[in-house]
Amino acid sequence: MNKPIVGILGFSDGDATAHKMLAPIVQKQIDVIVEALKKDGRIEVIVASDIVHSDKTAKGLAEELKAKGVDGTIFVNAVFAFPAFSVIAAKNGKGPYLLAAPIYPDWPGMVSMLAAGGGLDHEGIDHFRVAGDFNDPEVLEKTVTFAKCAMVVSRLNGQKYGLIGGRSLGMYSSTVSMQEWMEKFGIDVEHIDQLEIVRKADEVDEAQVEKAFQWLTDNVGKIEYNGTSFTPEKLKTQIRHYEATKKIIEENELDFVGVKCHYEMSAHYCTQCLSAAFLNDPYDWDGSKEPFVCACEADSDAALTMQILKMLTGDPVIFMDVRHWDQANGVMEFCNCGSQSTYYAAKSDDYKENLANVTLYPALDLYPGGGCHVNLQTKPGKATIARLCRRKKNGETRYYMTIIPCEFVELPKEREALTTKEWPHVFAKLPFEHQVFLERFGANHCHAVYGDHVDELKMICRMLNVDVEMYE
């Protein structure tokens, strides 16, 4: 996983004599911060070549760090520095910005941070603050969280999303405005026809298909061929579609994708379930790889939510449907129509352990193109569910993210047959009454990763000017 890169910019007094006296104090605090971050090892730091002590140095040093590709910038306030310098630097540098001040009585660094923050507020420049000793684990963790979130926001800008196909099954909440995405997130939307998958599937090398087929045969727990809609040859067709999709991603330099599937592909060629599973996985038959976000049914806000979660954690992300409230077990059942990252079958770094818990079932008769669905049950653990949605109110449409901390639990395998046994299942304990979820949630799809990432997602939303919605 790539590390965040943060710039470190120290601020001093604008009076030449005072600056000469105060510069060593500022430098000492810069050194403390840099040493703590380097020792921790989760962040790469780039320190400005000088300390800000004038309008010109504020502009020039901020531009210097921006040119070096930082994801965000830490403003170091160790003494009382002219607050105007922070405003000038923020106007010309690379945000998001974290104002950092030590807490000690010798010098008014905290005063400087508050004055600088007030100036940024006046200019409408949102920012974050941390005060204390950077060797304090709590202060360090706040800084690392800022850096991780800044990296997600910074690196989303300039990405390219591949919308393969169009709106699926009439789902309004799956479509987005390419102009809005560019303006708000800096993401370009590239429309690609699904026929490209079919065309490129014919070009896939047969040796690669046989390699993949043998790997699946050797490692997947069960492959339930039925002799009609799901045969070895149909599985090979799905392999070709996966390889074709990878080629489309490579040739178009895509960063994440959504694939329509229903019904053109699922009715006439095959389901895209194998692609949705192994693109999101950290492995395939060619070995270890970075998970690549693929959203089913061309749900673009799903894909963006998943991309944020993947960039934040480095982990595969679950795509799931909100399917059923199980009153008897007190769990919400999430069950996507056909596929999910197989990593969650055992949450193991060993693909063999994961795939041993996977079953490839024949696609439902609803999808006459045939092929397989990818069945598994997600292993227990603390997790975070998230979903970007949009709401129009008083003529203004705003993005918001629903964030739900939860606990994945395991139920007997036979319980899956209550809904659709062929599909992947996630059972989750929610921290609120399920009626709240059903009354307020703004989509039929949601997404999840292991771990508690609520605070990080809240910070990312603030950086993106996205509202946060949490249920109680």
Task: Identify the meaning behind each predicted range.
Residues M1-I51, S173-E224:
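N-terminal glycine-rich anion-binding loop in soluble enzyme alpha/beta folds
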Residues I8, K148-E180, K184-I187, A328-N354:
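Conserved anion/nucleotide-ligand pocket segment
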Residues W215, N219-L312:
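Long, internal scaffold/assembly segments composed of regular secondary structure
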